[in-house]
Design a protein with these regions (language model features):
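Internal, active-site/partner-interface "lid" segment
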Residues: 132, 146, 173-206
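Glycine-rich phosphate-binding loops that contact phosphosugars or nucleotide phosphates
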Residues: 33, 42-175
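An N-terminal, well-structured beta->alpha segment
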Residues: 1-37, 41
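Short, charged low-complexity intrinsically disordered segments located at boundaries
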Residues: 37-47, 64, 193-205
């Protein structure tokens, strides 16, 4: 069993190292920065199923690090939640296949409401309807899932998470986000205490 677990780790690490690092990353950061920090919009993330859970994590991590973001469930968007979208926002949609019906429909609904809102896509395939609808798309490298059936999102969601982490860290650098900024947004728990220590906030409060 240990050897099998090591093999799983190795395959997932290989998938991460094989993520295509293209100009799309810089383009995505430029779009998010322009819309959120230049126009006071927000980053709206979306995905269905396991990809949706990754999209939700990306949204909360962006928000914690100075870039206002929120997750929009693609199905709930069709029942009124699309109203959360505003004209200066940017939509980040995630779909490994690039063919997820609910995400394609979400972009179509977005176009009916605010066609000027740019769309960034994270996908495993550039030759898909979703990539065609994107202003910018980031490819995952379409890694094979480590799932025994080759079906359950495993490696693909790992790669999506890493891509999201890269975007977050690049944006933190771009906006000069520091420990003091973090402490103001993450007051509770160990990380809140640590960020206040790093920023000297604890000493100022005493």
């Amino acid at each position: 069993m240990k050897e099998k677990i090591r093999e799983i780790f190795k395959n997932e690490a290989t998938a991460i190292n094989n993520i295509p690092v293209t100009d799309s990353f810089e383009e995505a950061i430029s779009i998010i920065y322009r819309q959120v920090h230049g126009k006071n919009g927000k980053l709206v993330t979306s995905g269905m199923g396991k990809a949706g859970q990754i999209a939700h994590n990306i949204a909360t991590t962006f928000s914690a690090t100075g870039t206002p973001s929120i997750f929009l469930h693609p199905s709930e968007a069709q029942h009124g939640d699309l109203g959360i979208l505003q004209v200066n926002d940017v939509l980040l949609a995630i779909s490994n296949s690039g063919k997820t019906r609910e995400i394609i429909e979400l972009i179509e609904l977005k176009n009916n409401l605010y066609p000027e809102v740019p769309v960034i896509v994270i996908t495993g395939n550039e030759n898909t309807p979703l990539a065609d609808k994107a202003d910018c798309y980031i490819l995952t490298g379409a890694p094979a899932e480590v799932c025994l059936l080759g079906l359950t999102p495993t490696t693909s969601t790992t790669v999506m998470t890493v891509i999201g982490d890269a975007l977050v860290v690049m944006m933190m650098e771009k906006i000069g986000f520091n420990a003091g900024d973090y402490a103001k947004r993450h007051h509770g728990g160990y990380l809140g205490m640590k960020s206040r220590e790093l920023s000297g906030e604890d000493k100022r409060q005493k």
